[in-house]
């Protein structure tokens, strides 16, 4: 990891913690705010620790893009959780043969940048 990339990643990590410190739930209730702040902190720690040993610059760039997208989406929609995605048309084909391969391809292509680190939910 280059020095510039390292500084960018550390800056994102710090900005997430600053965001969590100032976060207010849209419901206005204190317990919701505390839960959402804790979710932000836990999610950041988990994903940064998961990706700390990456050496490929393209993968690092994808993770940085995902992080900035999740920050921007969270600030815009005022929710810390990833936005749900919907299956693409023809996404529920039979689970065998070519249908399965095309279904997996459609799901992979339709997955937005901000959900790259999340596992496939069945």
From Swiss-Prot:
Keywords: Nucleus. Pfam families: Complex1_LYR. The keyword Nucleus applies. High levels in adipose tissue. Its main location: nucleus. The keyword Nucleotidyltransferase does not apply. Coiled coil: none annotated. One of its GO terms (cellular component) is mitochondrion. It is found in: Nucleus. Belongs to the complex I LYR family. PANTHER family: LYR MOTIF-CONTAINING PROTEIN 1. May promote cell proliferation and inhibition of apoptosis of preadipocytes. It is linked to When overexpressed, may be involved in obesity-associated insulin resistance, possibly by causing mitochondrial dysfunction in adipocytes. This is LYR motif-containing protein 1. It comes from Homo sapiens. The lineage of its organism: Eukaryota, Metazoa, Chordata, Craniata, Vertebrata.
């Amino acid at each position: 990891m280059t020095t510039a990339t390292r500084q960018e990643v550390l800056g994102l990590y710090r900005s997430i913690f600053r965001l969590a410190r100032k976060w207010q739930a849209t419901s206005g209730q204190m317990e919701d705010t505390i839960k959402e702040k804790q979710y932000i902190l836990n999610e950041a720690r988990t994903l940064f620790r998961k990706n700390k040993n990456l050496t490929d610059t393209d993968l690092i760039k994808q993770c940085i893009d995902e992080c900035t997208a999740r920050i921007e989406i969270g600030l815009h929609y005022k929710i810390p959780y990833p936005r749900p995605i919907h299956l693409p048309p023809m996404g529920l084909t039979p689970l065998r043969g070519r249908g399965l391969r095309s279904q997996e391809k459609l799901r992979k292509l339709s997955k937005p940048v901000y959900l790259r680190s999340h596992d496939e939910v069945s």
